[in-house]
Amino acid sequence: MKVFQYEFPDMLIKVSNNRKYLEDLCAGKVYMNESGYFRKLEDTYRGDKFDGKCVISFENHTGEFMELGPEESPEERIKIPLDFIQNFTVGFKGDNKIPLYCCSQLSEHILRKETEFSLKFKEEFISEMEQFGSYYAIFSKVEFLQNMLDYIDDNQLGGKWGAVSYVDIHSEYHIEILNDENRNQYNVFFKKDLSYQWQNEWRIILVSSGAPLIGENDHHFVASIKPLSWFHIGHIRELRDNSIEIKEVDDSEVDGNVLRQ
């Protein structure tokens, strides 16, 4: 991964109020929230009522009707006058019970150059993270993802992962998306409104072809993966007080002290 002109290891940051939660993560216990969790927090700073949903916009729709149905079967298509429709939100059955794990991704977006050979976290990112807790863990994205993929394979699950794109969520989706039978219904979990951009999020979700992984009366799922071989846990004030030093290393060298005073 390139950060400014430097080759940098892919790193993830997880913030929590519970240090034990972060210790469990590094030991291989990944507590995944149900995907509807943040919709329940819509009245708090952390909440997002549109997380995992399509907000259908009619702002740029020029026709008088909304047409729904398969294009190859015109007789099955229906027309609905737009006079009777306002913007609405679309999801799918069970879209609130998918195991989801989110972190922040180390990138240029949340870093600034302090000197030629040191970087600092931007204040916007730190302020955002302070809303989520007092402790953080930093660890290798490559190792974490590989351990999660091993878990997915061992348990015959499906999954999707990647960085979140930040968009104007109220104009991102148009009515035509409902007629796209080839769209991946899970893509919506990887787009969030621009107002959340300082979270700089990276996510992974798990999908089962059988029974739901999170039952109706449950609220989280625990994925038991191999322990992480490299990580650092600290107080979030370190992100503000300390710098990331850049130095040349041999391919075989691993520097565990990412943050230095």
Descriptions of predicted regions:
Residues 1-261:
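NAD-dependent ADP-ribosyltransferases
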